[in-house]
Curated annotation (Swiss-Prot):
It is a peripheral membrane protein. It is an enzyme of class 7 (translocase). Gene3D superfamilies: NADH:ubiquinone oxidoreductase, 30kDa subunit. GO terms for cellular component: mitochondrial inner membrane; mitochondrial membrane; mitochondrion; myelin sheath; nuclear body; respiratory chain complex I. It comes from the Eukaryota. This is NADH dehydrogenase [ubiquinone] iron-sulfur protein 3, mitochondrial. It comes from Mus musculus. Keywords: Electron transport, Membrane, Mitochondrion, Mitochondrion inner membrane, NAD, Oxidoreductase, Respiratory chain, Transit peptide, Translocase, Transport, Ubiquinone. Residues 1-35 form a transit peptide. Coiled coil: none annotated. Pfam families: Complex1_30kDa (PF00329). It is found in: Mitochondrion inner membrane.
Amino acid sequence: MAAAAARVWCRGLLGAASVGRGAGRPSVLWQHVRRESAAADKRPTVRPRSDVTHKQLSAFGEYVAEILPKYVQQVQVSCLDELEICIHPDGVIPTLTFLRDHTNAQFKSLADLTAVDVPTRQNRFEIVYNLLSLRFNSRIRVKTYADELTPIDSIVSVHIAANWYEREVWDMFGVFFFNHPDLRRILTDYGFEGHPFRKDFPLTGYVELRYDDEVKRVVAEPVELAQEFRKFDLNSPWEAFPAYRQPPESLKLEAGDKKPETK
């Protein structure tokens, strides 16, 4: 009986030792799982296209076009399942009001309002409204257009969040919003000339600000691009780094050495 108990006890010790030795080395299955996880991490985090979502967005865009045929000019769904509705400038308030109040839409949150400047177009400015529906967890993009002189109706009465957005578009692009309660610059300083986000705005601007120690205040002056005289050696384009050039043969000769004669 004692011998049998001793054999069982020895087997237990050997099994525990084998488990201890194996604990330090990952099993084949664990190595396979780690390789799969490493391969999955390298995949691009791009949302896959859903045919069901694409069809639903297309159907909703066609529905909006049927309800507002006077204003909706184009409906399109991008490859990433993003619905875009292009409307006439006169239909900004009716379209956004419909999208906010309709039961099947409820786009009550204005996520962003911006503009794009395309100087080659007749109506160079593209106004973009990004709307969010918390009820249906959906987004929609409404686009319209304008030029330098034609104003766009303000949507502050529809979305109060558009107040500062429209001020920013006016400041950066110069698009005027009609019936805005307080349309003034929001990012640039008082008396700023021009609109920085226009494609024809110079990179240096028109004026520069500096502190004048004589008058003890900040003064605005026309931009002066003063540059010191620089001499360029254009003999060889490969000698841009003189410190790394090969030293001439005369510098290699020590004092008293004679230059070897060439045959």
